[in-house]
Amino acid sequence: MSEPRWTRRKAQRPTELLAAALELFVERGYAATRLDDVAKRAGVSKGTVYLYFAGKEELFKAVVREGVVPVLKRGEKMVSGHTGTTAALIGDLMRGWWAAIGSTPYAGLIKLMVSECRNFPELGRFYSDEVITRGYQLVRKALQRGIDRGELRAIDPEYVSRLVFAPLVLAVIWRYSFDYCGVSQLDPSRYIEQHLEVLLSGLLAPSVAPSRARVRTAGTRA
């Protein structure tokens, strides 16, 4: 016997509230988003929001934990279980991040934090702990793997981990700023592939550099 419709609807409400909150946070920013508006966007009363979340800050944290953190978990598993070259791993991480975050509404949270973390330092620290620090850690692990295997030069993973994704973060910021002014954006796929070419030219050990074409995985144009 199937569940009553109202029961199924109730089970979906947290997801619907998170989706509405994400839309509004990206559209209006954190400061300008009100719980009344989130409730209206989700088609529920404001009181319903409080049944699931203590307030706007908890709602924001839930958006991050439900939508962004799982992507990091998948990235960590990818790094731990990868059996191919480190060049291919770095490429897979970049393409995977863009597909799961950079090309989705969750990318708007990056622009939001850049704009508003100064006024909301607690949220900034939360985002740094839950997302930024964890992201850099998995990239550092990938880089250290390459160094240990003799595939990468003896670079400093602490600093290079930040350089790896900096161009992608810039692409996201551009998307949520200049794109709205009619300034054209470069094709993301080509942008990522060109970044990989330049990055790996500097990272790969001399003995590996001639084979850097192996960075291209199945389905990627040569």
Please place each PLM-identified region on the residue numbering.
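Basic, helix-initiating cap at the start of DNA-binding domains
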Residues: 1-44, 51-58, 84
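Amphipathic, non-transmembrane alpha-helical scaffold segments
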Residues: 10, 18, 64, 90, ...
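Short helix-capping/turn signature of helix-turn-helix
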Residues: 53, 114-120, 130-131
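Hydrophobic alpha-helical connector segments
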Residues: 62, 76-110, 158-164, 192
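Short, basic, alpha-helical segments at the C-terminal edge of helix-turn-helix-like DNA-binding modules
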Residues: 65-71
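Amphipathic alpha-helical packing segments from all-alpha helical-bundle domains
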Residues: 88, 99-103, 108, 122-148, ...
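Hydrophobic/aromatic-rich alpha-helical bundle segments in the mid-to-C-terminal region
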Residues: 125, 147-196, 207-215, 222
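C-terminal alpha-helix
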Residues: 142, 198-206
